[in-house]
Amino acid sequence: MSMVETAPSKIQVRDLNFYYGKFHALKNINLDIAKNQVTAFIGPSGCGKSTLLRTFNKMYSLYPEQRAEGEILLDGDNILTNTQDIALLRAKVGMVFQKPTPFPMSIYDNIAFGVRLFEKLSRADMDERVQWALTKAALWNETKDKLHQSGYSLSGGQQQRLCIARGIAIRPEVLLLDEPCSALDPISTGRIEELITELKQDYTVVIVTHNMQQAARCSDHTAFMYLGELIEFSNTDDLFTKPAKKQTEDYITGRYG
């Protein structure tokens, strides 16, 4: 099962294959990512879920030995073409990584940095954008009195929310989250999960997670991957309660992986 038709598609993946040199990492992937919903990728380490996520904003483009074949359609436009403007793509498709990665600058400038690359705002408008992004990331009340302190002064959970605020400050259409809670404590993880659920009101969210309970709590749709192949993709509740494939059932019940 590769299509989820409960909402319009934001991203359509068609016959996608990906290679690290000669290693065939993704094999004939076909799936649709629903607009303004949360889609989770699960599977054992090395199954290709992070590789798939990173094709959505061509993170591999700096490495000539890595290549993608097939189509990834963002609102109907194939982003895998050589004519795709990478900077414009990454303005539309933001990304938050596994480990919090604040820039070595103030909290304010962490948010403003990306905005300045794409927009020329007055100071008042930039102040408003910074407040908006931090509010969206549930971080404004904790940082409003120390905006000019270093981003490194924040706790790990706060730093990850800062990275989310930085990602949405340029107003992308899609937000990619690669294991965003793996380095966080349970309380910080809970806050990030609440935030993910809220973000889908404005963004299409795709999350990679090793935590199946997290996928069950946060996502509307879940894809199970194994050895570079998409094994099953369906409504999250259905995948976890009545999986269609034995491989999926074995994985979610802990029989392998």
Swiss-Prot record:
Gene3D superfamilies membership: P-loop containing nucleotide triphosphate hydrolases
Protein name as it appears in the record: Phosphate import ATP-binding protein PstB
Source organism, top-level taxon: Bacteria
Reaction catalysed by this enzyme: phosphate(out) + ATP + H2O = ADP + 2 phosphate(in) + H(+)
Family: Belongs to the ABC transporter superfamily. Phosphate importer (TC 3.A.1.7) family.
Location of the ABC transporter domain: 11-252
PANTHER family according to UniProt: ABC TRANSPORTER I FAMILY MEMBER 17, PHOSPHATE IMPORT ATP-BINDING PROTEIN PSTB
Tagged with keyword Nucleotide-binding: yes
Keywords tagged on the record: ATP-binding, Cell inner membrane, Cell membrane, Membrane, Nucleotide-binding, Phosphate transport, Translocase, Transport
A Pfam family hit: ABC_tran
Lipid bilayer topology: Peripheral membrane protein
Molecular functions (GO terms): ATP binding; ATP hydrolysis activity; ATPase-coupled phosphate ion transmembrane transporter activity
Listed InterPro entries: AAA+_ATPase, ABC_transporter-like_ATP-bd, ABC_transporter-like_CS, P-loop_NTPase, PstB-like
First-listed, main subcellular location of the protein, grouped into a coarse class: membrane
Function: Part of the ABC transporter complex PstSACB involved in phosphate import. Responsible for energy coupling to the transport system.
GO biological process: phosphate ion transmembrane transport
Gene: pstB
Annotated GO CC locations: plasma membrane
Subunit: The complex is composed of two ATP-binding proteins (PstB), two transmembrane proteins (PstC and PstA) and a solute-binding protein (PstS).
The enzyme's E.C. designation: 7.3.2.1
Cell compartments where the protein resides: Cell inner membrane
Binding site for ATP: G43, P44, S45, G46, C47, G48, K49, S50
